[in-house]
Amino acid sequence: MHGRLKVKTSEEQAEAKRLEREQKLKLYQSATQAVFQKREAGELDESVLELTSQILGANPDFATLWNCRREVLQQLETQKSPEELAALVKAELGFLESCLRVNPKSYGTWHHRCWLLSRLPEPNWARELELCARFLEADERNFHCWDYRRFVAAQAAVAPAEELAFTDSLITRNFSNYSSWHYRSCLLPQLHPQPDSGPQGRLPENVLLRELELVQNAFFTDPNDQSAWFYHRWLLGRAEPHDVLCCLHVSREEACLSVCFSRPLIVGSKMGTLLLTVDEAPLSVEWRTPDGRNRPSHVWLCDLPAASLNDHLPQHTFRVIWTGSDTQKECVLLKGHQECWCRDSATDEQLFRCELSVEKSTVLQSELESCKELQELEPENKWCLLTIILLMRALDPLLYEKETLEYFSTLKAVDPMRAAYLDDLRSKFLVENSVLKMEYADVRVLHLAHKDLTVLCHLEQLLLVTHLDLSHNRLRALPPALAALRCLEVLQASDNVLENLDGVANLPRLRELLLCNNRLQQSAALQTLASCPRLVFLNLQGNSLCQEEGIRERLAEMLPSVSSILT
C-alpha cells in the first residue's frame, strides 16, 4: 500500500460535495442578504454591483438582482463623469456576455442588455449584431437571442434585405433552422409590401416562386425535418383575401337586411362601419349580430322601416357600403317579391383559394409530382403526405377530391396521434367542396350527409341556403355560426352525436328540425330552440331525453309554437 495515492471512498466523496454545497449556499445567502440590506438602506453604490456580480455570475436568472443593478446604474448615472460612465457600461456589457456564456437563454440577462443599450446615446449596434451571430452559431434555435437580434435590427434600422441575407447564410449552413425560416416569414412581407393586400396578403409572384424553390430544396435534402415543411405551408397561405362584404340579403316579410363578411368583424369599430342607402337616400339604422351580442361576427343585421319596403312602388334599391375596405353590395327588391340578394360569384378561387397564374400553377404542379415521388421513397413521412394534400387543394380541390381523401386515410394511419386534427381538416375540405358544387349548380340546398364530418365550417357562405342536410356524420355540436343561415327552413341533423343544441338559435325561418338518434339527454338542451319563431316540426326520436317522464308536456310548455314534436 505504500507509495499509492489514497482514493476517497464514495461516502467521503459525497460528504465532501455536501460540505462544498453548504459552503456555496452560505456564501450565496450572505451575499443576497447583504444586497437586500443595502437596497433597503438606500445604499445603491458600486459595492452592490460587486455583490450582485458574484451571485448572477453563477445564477443569471435571479430577476430581483437585475432590478437592483438597474437601480444602482441609474443612481451612478447622476454621479459619474462621462468617461467613468463609459468604462462602467463597457464593464457591464462584458459582465452580461459572461452571464450569457453561463446561460445563453437567460431572460433576465437579455432583458438587462436591452435596457442598458436603450439608455446609451450612441450604442455600438454592429457589435451587438456580431454578438447575436456568435450565440446563434452556438445554438441556432435560441429564441432569446433571435428576439434580441430583432430588437437590435429595429434600433439600428438594419434593412430587411440585410437580415434576409443573414437568414440565407444560416439556412445554407443548416436547412433545419426553424427560427431562420420563421424570421424569413416576418421579413418578406416587409421587403415586398403589396398595396391593398392586408397583413396576410400575397407576396409578389416572382418572390413566391423563388421561395418555393428554396424550401423545396430544403425538404428534399432532409424530408424528416419539419422546419421547411412549416415554411412551405406558410407560403401556400400567402394569398388570404382581405376583408370583403360578400353577401347582401333583404327580406320584405321580416323587414330585415342582412350582410355577410368574409371574416368575423365588429361593425362600428376602428375596422370600419356599414353605410346603408335605400333608393339613393341614406338611412340611419342600428346594426346588430344575430344573437344581439356586440362581438365579431360574419353576419350583421338591421331592421328596415316600413317606408323602405312599400309594395306600391315598382322597386326599392338597397346599397350597403363597408368603409373598412371600401367595398359595397347592391340589390333591388321588386314589387311582389319577398326577398332579394346580391353575392359574389362563387368560384373556388374566390371562395377558398386565390386564382393561380399559369406560372404558379406550373410550379405547384411540379412540386406535387416531386412530393409524390418523395412519398414513394418515404411512405411514412407525414409532412410529405400533408403537403401533397395542401398542394392538391391549392391546384384544384374538386379535381383531386377522391385522391385527397385517400391521402387523408394514409396520413391518419401514419400519424394516429393527430387523428382528430386530421378529421377536422378533412371535414373542412369536404364542406368547401360541397359548397363549391352547390354554387356551381346554382341551388340553395346543401347536402352534407354521410361524409363522416366532425366539424362544420364556412357557414358564413350559406346565408342563402334554405335546406341543409347534416345527417349521418360525427358532429358533437352545431356551432353558433349557424346563425348565419338567415334563410334556413329545414335542418336535418339526425344520426350524429350531438350533445347540445347551443348553436341552433336565432334562425328566423327555420320550420323543420330533425334530430333523431343523437345524444341529447336533457330537455334543457332544447331551450335555445325557443329563439326560432317559425319552428313547427321537431323530431327527437332515438334520444335519451325521450325517456324522461312527462317530456312531451315539458316540451310543449318550453316550445309552444312547435305544433308537432316526435319523441
UniProtKB/Swiss-Prot annotation:
SUPFAM superfamilies: Outer arm dynein light chain 1 (SSF52075), Protein prenylyltransferase (SSF48439), Rab geranylgeranyltransferase alpha-subunit, insert domain (SSF49594). Keywords: Leucine-rich repeat, Phosphoprotein, Prenyltransferase, Repeat, Transferase. PFTA repeats lie at residues 44-78, 88-122, 124-158, 159-193, 207-241, 363-397. Its EC number is 2.5.1.60. The keyword Transferase applies. InterPro entries: LRR_dom_sf, Prenyl_trans_a, RabGGT_asu_insert-dom_sf, RabGGT_asu_insert-domain. One of its GO terms (molecular function) is small GTPase binding. It is an enzyme of class 2 (transferase). The modification Phosphoserine is found at residue 98. LRR repeats lie at residues 442-463, 464-486, 487-508, 509-530, 534-555. The enzymatic reaction requires the aid of a Rab escort protein (also called component A), such as CHM. Signal peptide: none annotated. One of its GO terms (cellular component) is Rab-protein geranylgeranyltransferase complex. It comes from the Eukaryota. Catalyzes the transfer of a geranylgeranyl moiety from geranylgeranyl diphosphate to both cysteines of Rab proteins with the C-terminal sequence -XXCC, -XCXC and -CCXX, such as RAB1A, RAB3A, RAB5A and RAB7A. Heterotrimer composed of RABGGTA, RABGGTB and CHM; within this trimer, RABGGTA and RABGGTB form the catalytic component B, while CHM (component A) mediates peptide substrate binding. The Rab GGTase dimer (RGGT) interacts with CHM (component A) prior to Rab protein binding; the association is stabilized by geranylgeranyl pyrophosphate (GGpp). The CHM:RGGT:Rab complex is destabilized by GGpp. Interacts with non-phosphorylated form of RAB8A; phosphorylation of RAB8A at 'Thr-72' disrupts this interaction. It is linked to Defects in Rabggta are the cause of the gunmetal (gm) phenotype. Mice homozygous for gm have prolonged bleeding, thrombocytopenia and reduced platelet alpha- and delta-granule contents. Belongs to the protein prenyltransferase subunit alpha family. This is Geranylgeranyl transferase type-2 subunit alpha. It comes from Mus musculus.
